[in-house]
């Protein structure tokens, strides 16, 4: 059995919290946005994924040192460059007490490959997935894929029975505004389950008594997510004690928060690349009044690059 720290479960880049709590039973957590949907395959977006990770798990995950670690799979191997064999944990249950088996993994990977899934590009090389037995899954790729484990760390496993019962076998079409049961309800194998959902206001997570893991910070039995869009208001809520944990504190406020004896600033590495994209193809920009598209000119793109203070970003 593996021990997980509460912060590892949140899997965030930078967070500040009230250090005097040593963590109470209920943690009030805030960030800028809320989850767009509870469907774990519908939207690949920061706050949405953070919420999903409290409830759902994948075959593998990344540790705090960014290495690939077992999660629902205990081990894996390749029999040839295009064939992967995953051995699953045999003590995993969903939060309703039902067992997780290879049929749930097969269902989830195929669901994540659907047209409406926002995670389909992660597993675009997966050409087949098969349950060898209750706790063995074979994944076949159309070509060698050395980063498949990294990609599978983002594919959350759902209960096939729960999805079929609630007409949620297809990933929510979020772009079309589709409303589905899986968009407003969640049931996974993770350390928490959702007991209250008020979008953009409050989401309550309670400990999943069926979780296979062992939470080191076992005093935490409940988490209240309270999204606060305005950065200044969010920081004020932290400093006043209205919330205990903020996972996206503004950089300019970190020194002030850290100077408080009642608060602590922690940071971890993360697998994320932020980039600036420019439309170099269109003759005219979709917005603005510049006339011809300036980004078609190499000199303009170079000027934009020179204007970026890279050293300041590094700091």
Predicted regions mapped to residue ranges:
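Bacterial N-terminal signal peptides that target proteins for export
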Residues: 1-10
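Sec/Tat signal peptide C-region and signal peptidase I cleavage site
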Residues: 18-24
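A local structural motif
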Residues: 25, 69, 84, 125, ...
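N-terminal lobe/hinge region of extracytoplasmic solute-binding protein
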Residues: 30-80, 110, 187
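A structural "hinge/loop" feature
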Residues: 34-49, 72, 148-157, 189, ...
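Extracytoplasmic/periplasmic ligand-capture domains
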Residues: 61-64, 89-119, 128-130, 191-315
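Surface-exposed binding/hinge segments that line
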Residues: 77, 121-171
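Short, hydrophobic/aromatic-enriched beta-strand segments in well-ordered soluble domains
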Residues: 83-90, 135-144, 204-207
């Amino acid at each position: 059995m593996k021990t997980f720290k509460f912060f590892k479960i949140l899997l965030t880049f930078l967070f500040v919290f009230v250090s005097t709590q040593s963590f109470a039973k209920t943690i009030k957590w805030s960030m800028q946005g809320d989850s767009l949907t509870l469907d774990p395959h519908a939207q690949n977006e920061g706050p949405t994924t953070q919420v999903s990770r409290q409830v759902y798990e994948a075959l593998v995950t990344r540790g705090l040192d960014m290495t690939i670690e077992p999660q629902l799979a205990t081990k894996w191997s390749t029999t040839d460059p295009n064939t992967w064999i995953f051995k699953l944990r045999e003590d995993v249950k969903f939060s309703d007490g039902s067992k997780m088996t290879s049929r749930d993994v097969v269902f989830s990977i195929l669901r994540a490959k659907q047209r409406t899934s926002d995670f389909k590009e992660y597993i675009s090389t997966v050409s087949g997935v098969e349950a060898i037995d209750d706790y063995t899954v074979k994944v076949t790729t159309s070509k060698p894929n050395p980063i498949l484990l990294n990609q599978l760390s983002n594919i959350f496993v759902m209960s096939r029975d729960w999805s079929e019962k609630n007409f949620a076998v297809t990933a929510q079409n979020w772009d079309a505004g589709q409303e589905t049961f899986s968009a407003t309800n969640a049931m996974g194998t993770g350390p928490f389950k959702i007991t209250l959902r008020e979008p953009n206001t409050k989401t309550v997570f309670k400990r999943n008594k069926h979780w296979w893991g062992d939470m080191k910070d076992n005093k935490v039995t409940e988490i209240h997510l309270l999204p606060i869009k305005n950065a200044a208001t969010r920081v004020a809520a932290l400093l006043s004690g209205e919330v205990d944990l903020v996972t996206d504190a503004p950089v300019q406020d970190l020194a002030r928060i850290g100077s408080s004896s009642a608060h602590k600033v922690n940071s971890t590495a993360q697998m994320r690349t932020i980039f600036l994209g420019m439309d170099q193809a269109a003759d005219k920009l979709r917005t603005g009044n510049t006339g011809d598209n300036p980004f078609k000119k190499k000199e303009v793109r170079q000027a934009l690059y020179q204007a970026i203070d890279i050293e300041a970003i590094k700091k």
